[in-house]
Amino acid sequence: MGGKNKKHKAPAAAVVRAAVSASRAKSAEAGIAGEAQSKKPVSRPATAAAAAAGSREPRVKQGPKIYSFNSTNDSSGPANLDKSILKVVINNKLEQRIIGVINEHKKQNNDKGMISGRLTAKKLQDLYMALQAFSFKTKDIEDAMTNTLLYGGDLHSALDWLCLNLSDDALPEGFSQEFEEQQPKSRPKFQSPQIQATISPPLQPKTKTYEEDPKSKPKKEEKNMEVNMKEWILRYAEQQNEEEKNENSKSLEEEEKFDPNERYLHLAAKLLDAKEQAATFKLEKNKQGQKEAQEKIRKFQREMETLEDHPVFNPAMKISHQQNERKKPPVATEGESALNFNLFEKSAAATEEEKDKKKEPHDVRNFDYTARSWTGKSPKQFLIDWVRKNLPKSPNPSFEKVPVGRYWKCRVRVIKSEDDVLVVCPTILTEDGMQAQHLGATLALYRLVKGQSVHQLLPPTYRDVWLEWSDAEKKREELNKMETNKPRDLFIAKLLNKLKQQQQQQQQHSENKRENSEDPEESWENLVSDEDFSALSLESANVEDLEPVRNLFRKLQSTPKYQKLLKERQQLPVFKHRDSIVETLKRHRVVVVAGETGSGKSTQVPHFLLEDLLLNEWEASKCNIVCTQPRRISAVSLANRVCDELGCENGPGGRNSLCGYQIRMESRACESTRLLYCTTGVLLRKLQEDGLLSNVSHVIVDEVHERSVQSDFLLIILKEILQKRSDLHLILMSATVDSEKFSTYFTHCPILRISGRSYPVEVFHLEDIIEETGFVLEKDSEYCQKFLEEEEEVTINVTSKAGGIKKYQEYIPVQTGAHADLNPFYQKYSSRTQHAILYMNPHKINLDLILELLAYLDKSPQFRNIEGAVLIFLPGLAHIQQLYDLLSNDRRFYSERYKVIALHSILSTQDQAAAFTLPPPGVRKIVLATNIAETGITIPDVVFVIDTGRTKENKYHESSQMSSLVETFVSKASALQRQGRAGRVRDGFCFRMYTRERFEGFMDYSVPEILRVPLEELCLHIMKCNLGSPEDFLSKALDPPQLQVISNAMNLLRKIGACELNEPKLTPLGQHLAALPVNVKIGKMLIFGAIFGCLDPVATLAAVMTEKSPFTTPIGRKDEADLAKSALAMADSDHLTIYNAYLGWKKARQEGGYRSEITYCRRNFLNRTSLLTLEDVKQELIKLVKAAGFSSSTTSTSWEGNRASQTLSFQEIALLKAVLVAGLYDNVGKIIYTKSVDVTEKLACIVETAQGKAQVHPSSVNRDLQTHGWLLYQEKIRYARVYLRETTLITPFPVLLFGGDIEVQHRERLLSIDGWIYFQAPVKIAVIFKQLRVLIDSVLRKKLENPKMSLENDKILQIITELIKTENN
């Protein structure tokens, strides 16, 4: 059956359909359109989207030269025009070495991946066809599927394998790697030749005719003819592509059918190319090349022969493949006169001659029917009517009777359009000419209305032959399909069998692994899971021998020190409750002790318990008491006090010491220690190693009323452990009356209430302080708030020299706010006080008023003769430092009459120890403290308390997913606690720096921390301890956090690669992060700093992130400070600028001593205290990383040494930036490049982040940065607009190595990170980065399994380090 039909595609799965579509038309536009069908909708670059849209636009004229990847299917050409999409290129030699490392790693780690149980032969076939559509070779496809599916891979894995393992010249078009100059090509539009020929009908036996070239034509003319033929084919294919693009009315069914004619044209062009190559190789006597070319020729001919048998193939396109047989001159036809040679059709005369030679029998039939048997239209009339209706512009069909001996057949010609003519001629012969015309009309209708049931409207005899043709076509199609797909189906069957066998082995292996799961791990990260609890037998544990400890305690009781302090202990309010406390603990496993501040519960309750366990021996087979404290300073000071009370001479952890302490990075305990004070975090880490606290007999949780995240988390775990351990006792100690909530949480356990030893405290509020001190609030004071101003219009008359009067309208600001706004309560105070109350800024701490108050205490008759310390509550270290400086520079406090002490957890222990010692008579001790002095520690001689009413809380903003340390007002409970600190030794006085009215508006209690902070670290601990999903676990909390907050925390952990995507399970990185008590992002940065040998500088940068920048900006000297910072700027990075300043400070300190150090700090506007703090925190972080098993390598050591005298090299800068990205991702944004018209004009750097646009903060060295690229930022803050603080310009490599979810878009030559960060890259390079991530994960996993393993000579880390350092070189 001949004729030309509309294009169809073969039905297949969606992904295969997309891949076939992508490979059909060899043009950039079609490539993009095809790939787009297989992708989920994601945010794409504007240029790529435009390119995709362009696939439906008409072809444009030749444009300027552009640079793109060498591919006719390359869609990245337009993307290359967008400079904001950065290109990624790797040195060729380094690329080959990296591929070698990747392949070597795969060989060494031959662990089979988990295979999906849903793989079927149909899915494997779809995958095979998808790869085939990309024009990969059959052998390569089979190798890829074998090497990926057996490892749990999919289509993308197979494409990755092919791109990684095939050489560039072996990759199909569209996957080429090299950049080349591309000139857009255009060909003249295809002009259709006039084809008129005798066409073989469908049931004709397959015969091949061979044409011979005239002997007179030379070889050169033959070659030119082949070139013209190839050009004609390409132009024909191009014309079809354009026609296809303009067909907007295609149905889905038509799109899913395969067109053999188009494939045949494509193969014909390739066949001619191969013949030219063969001829060239023959002249060059290149046997190997000639052999390969002949193989290609045979391959193309075999596929073309298969297509010739396709039921919808147009025989007019058929060409001869035989080279060795001479061709006969063709018989001239009408079409040949226009084209000079017949390209696509056989000579009808030649066909007749062959038939005669072979003497094949004719198929003669009688199609006669009577008027009685059929009253409808005849086939001929039906065809004429159909053409008139459906092709109104076409002439009526022509019928040409062809005699064959005494029989007839008919050639029917239907002109569908100027360049589309259908010519058919059945092979069946009839006895008369009219039947031949009806039969020809039936065949024409069969071709024109294929798939429709028109045959039911034809006479029975012609209806039968229609069905005969249809059945023969289906049968042939099935046979061809089976024959073509036989090798593929055989391969898929074998592969599916292997997959099933491996799946069974995996199931058996996992069952064996579960059976052996109780074997102990030789790792410091060994955990006790819920399943292992049943295996722990407490009864069989060795009973502790307490006799030596009891003897030691009896000996200590007889010492003078013990006896002396016993008398002091007996004066404490809690001491008279000793017996009731001990008895209650004997009867109940959980007890709540509610004692007021100063009652002595933190020291005495653990002491009572220890004494009773060691002396009375009440079922005491075990005596190990752990008392948790929220702060390090509390744990240390309480342990010191209890050691003194026990009579231990050598202090906590000393020889024969019964009491010790353990805080982060410091442990003071010995074999005889039976009472351990520790921070809550230390006990949580103990729970990671021993999920049941097997060696602990009593847990005391102090200061539970503070409701920190760690304490609430600890209570959930302890509640579950109590259900599994019948011998564990728990004591909760709270300083507030909110004890019922804790009792209810632990099934209504008993509450012991202990009143504090307190004296009456007189309270003065802000209005009283102003009235008594005579403080005057100046209008220009920084503490005076400015009200909104209203403008009043006035008319001003101005008299000129000539005597004329001009009128001007002016607007004069008028302040709003009046005394009527004050509460009537303040009417009893003076107008000066009322004015100050009205205008004083309540959100700013008035340090001037505090100085006036301190001076007033010494000159007022009411207070000057009262001895006692002054405790001032401030919100943070900055305010402490500021007030300390003011006191030091105020002449009124110069004398030895005053001793000023700053109390903060980051300050030295020696300075803080002075706060607890009594000063000499006549000396006023002034202690500056945060809320640490509220309940955690007790300063014994405090009589005066100055309460600013402010504190700092870490709050989480769900809308922006940002957290910040916010200064806020305290709760009523906290204010009362602060007030109570003044009544410890005598009648006290509390001065509140806020009004009585504001105090009444305070919240009763602070919001629990678990409800207002990010929960990443908490989720890490939950997964580390195998406590199930964080959502389920935290639902058991005293105050469960919102699910959205937990979800945000888990999303962040997934983004940084700390936990698995589909289950609450830690990755190797997450396991290591859980061992570091720091923010997860900083922890990740420290780990990568250690494994890449740059821990020292990274720890310095991490210390800055945990504290604050050392740069200062004095009032009135902003320009000087900015200039000094600019002089230290390095590598477009605020982080490296700070590190550069730190190096200079260390150099000045080492070479010139204190004076040189001070000069350097003043010249560069650096805070020396911040730098000293930074150094201390840095050393502490390094200790933490080493304690987690990451010892510093020789490379890391080289950063330390004499680094202060060196500058950073480009390679070192690249490495540091990469580690910064590893830690701070996904805090990245794309710089919106703005080209300024005026060169001198400085434009603020605008950055597009995942949440929207933001502006670089004015304090950043990148404030005026204008370039194409990406910016890393430390934090995002919102003032009048959103700003990015502490930014660094970064390159693509670190983002590709350490960023979020990476996706390779093979056809577009794009790499996407998290669906919105795009880079241009050849597919091979894209796959390399994807594989390198797997290798990094394997290094971390090995380190987890073997903590002592050295990473210094690891090949993977070495090659990645080299890759990072060589970027842009």
Curated annotation (Swiss-Prot):
Residues 27-75, 176-226, 502-526 are annotated as: Disordered. Residues 849-1026 form the Helicase C-terminal domain. It is found in: Cytoplasm. It catalyses: ATP + H2O = ADP + phosphate + H(+). Residues 189-201 have a biased composition (Polar residues). GO terms for molecular function: ATP binding; ATP hydrolysis activity; cadherin binding; helicase activity; ribonucleoside triphosphate phosphatase activity; ribosomal small subunit binding; RNA binding; RNA helicase activity. It is an enzyme of class 3 (hydrolase). Its EC number is 3.6.4.13. Residues 222-256, 283-310, 492-519 form a coiled coil. InterPro entries: DEAD-box_helicase_OB_fold (IPR011709), DEAD/DEAH_box_helicase_dom (IPR011545), DHX29 (IPR034730), DNA/RNA_helicase_DEAH_CS (IPR002464), DSRM_DHX29 (IPR056328), HA2_WH (IPR048333), Helicase-assoc_dom (IPR007502), Helicase_ATP-bd (IPR014001). GO terms for biological process: formation of translation preinitiation complex; positive regulation of translational initiation; ribosome assembly. A motif (DEAH box) lies at residues 702-705. The modification Phosphoserine is found at S71, S192, S200. It comes from the Eukaryota. Part of the 43S pre-initiation complex (PIC) that contains at least Met-tRNA, EIF1, EIF1A (EIF1AX or EIF1AY), EIF2S1, EIF2S2, EIF2S3, EIF3A, EIF3B, EIF3C, EIF3D, EIF3E, EIF3F, EIF3G, EIF3H, EIF3I, EIF3J, EIF3K, EIF3L, EIF3M, DHX29 and the 40S ribosomal subunit. ATP-binding RNA helicase involved in translation initiation. Part of the 43S pre-initiation complex that is required for efficient initiation on mRNAs of higher eukaryotes with structured 5'-UTRs by promoting efficient NTPase-dependent 48S complex formation. Specifically binds to the 40S ribosome near the mRNA entrance. Does not possess a processive helicase activity. This is ATP-dependent RNA helicase DHX29. It comes from Homo sapiens.
